[in-house]
Regions:
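Domain-terminus/edge residues, biased toward the C-terminal soluble/receptor-binding domains
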Residues: 93-94, 107-110, 114-327
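Active-site-adjacent loops and short helices of periplasmic peptidoglycan-processing enzymes
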Residues: 2-117, 121-125
Length: 327
């Protein structure tokens, strides 16, 4: 259901889908609402807006709403699953496969808690305005030909008053109860994913415990601010002998408090760098290590243009380098 929402959000963001666009409910989608699964309770032939279907998926956990979205976007659930898998590949979800839009039991539906965390992070980061839906505690569906139905959000941690604002519950016969949850305290956000809980109560209790443990035991450190000078690299035969470089994104790292002393940042580049240099050129990389294990790599980008020296200055510079080894 998280991935189904992501596909819809991506299309809305690109302008290829509108919230007020309506999809006609098929008999196949309606039958899901009568089969005992969590549902939005759509009716055959109903014309339902994308906005309401998304609320039905996110808040009411409607499997029928998932299928309606899938058919409306891709023509069939099979086609939609292909789109889901393409997105999973794009996100680096290497141990995931989607066979349908809802997560209903199918041997070809599988994932890992890590992949689900990556997917959740993508949704939160890239669609913050729509992520707001995940903290809504109820949804009223004024359905055609029937009384309005109000359903509560199935995420139990939304009601625990600890700051959780999403994201999604799950259930499979094989893995029982699962939950992807997220909490924000100040500028820190943590995502926790758990699976294999035997009861709803243990899912809620253990997921809450995991989030609180994360808040208590981990610290988020800012490595670099987007487009702000990070360091200088040596330049060869340039009008300046140093070039400012930056990282083109904000870089934060959450680490266990006891590992802070093991955090190392190493700069890699083949230098001195030959001028001319253009602003935006990738000149090297920054590697982040914890306990000598590389955990992240980021490009070092030139913050400025460096012109090449004239011929006389280059000759003198070469002589100076041969004598003193200094650029």
């Amino acid at each position: 259901k998280i991935m189904t929402s992501i596909i819809a959000f991506d299309l809305i963001k690109s302008g290829d889908l509108k919230l007020d666009e309506k999809f006609i409910i098929s008999e196949k989608a309606w039958r899901l609402s009568t089969a005992g699964y969590s549902s939005m309770f759509v009716m055959v032939g109903d014309e339902v807006s994308v906005e309401n279907l998304l609320k039905g998926i996110i808040i009411a956990s409607g499997n029928d709403a998932c299928l309606a979205i899938a058919e409306g976007i891709a023509g069939s659930e099979e086609n939609f699953a292909e789109i889901m898998n393409e997105k999973a590949s794009e996100l680096g979800m290497t141990n995931t496969n989607f066979a349908n839009s809802s997560g209903i039991n199918d041997p070809d539906n599988y994932s890992t808690v890590r992949d689900i965390a990556m997917m959740s992070q993508y949704l939160i980061k890239n669609h913050p305005e729509y992520y707001e839906l995940f903290k809504e505690t109820k949804f009223t569906w004024d359905r055609t030909g029937g009384d309005p139905i109000t359903q509560g959000n199935r995420n139990p941690l939304l009601y625990k008053n600890i700051g959780v604002d999403g994201i999604k519950t799950g259930y499979l016969n094989s893995e029982k109860y699962s939950l992807a949850s997220s909490i924000k305290r100040g500028n820190r956000r943590l995502i926790a994913v758990g699976s294999g809980f035997k009861t709803k109560n243990s899912r809620s209790k253990q997921s809450r415990k995991l989030l609180i443990w994360g808040l208590s035991n981990f610290k988020t450190i800012r490595i670099s601010e987007k487009n702000k000078p990070f360091t200088e690299l040596s330049v060869w035969q340039g009008k300046k002998n140093k070039v400012l470089v930056h990282l083109n994104r904000d870089v934060y790292k959450s680490i266990h408090k006891k590992d802070k002393k093991h955090l190392k940042i190493k700069i890699n580049y083949e230098g001195p760098i030959q001028a001319p240099i253009q602003k935006g050129d990738i000149l090297g990389s920054v590697n982040i290590y914890i306990k000598d294990e590389k955990v992240n790599t980021f490009d070092l980008v030139s913050s400025e243009n460096i012109k090449k020296q004239n011929i006389i200055a280059r000759i003198l510079g070469s002589i100076n380098f041969l004598i003193w080894g200094d650029v």
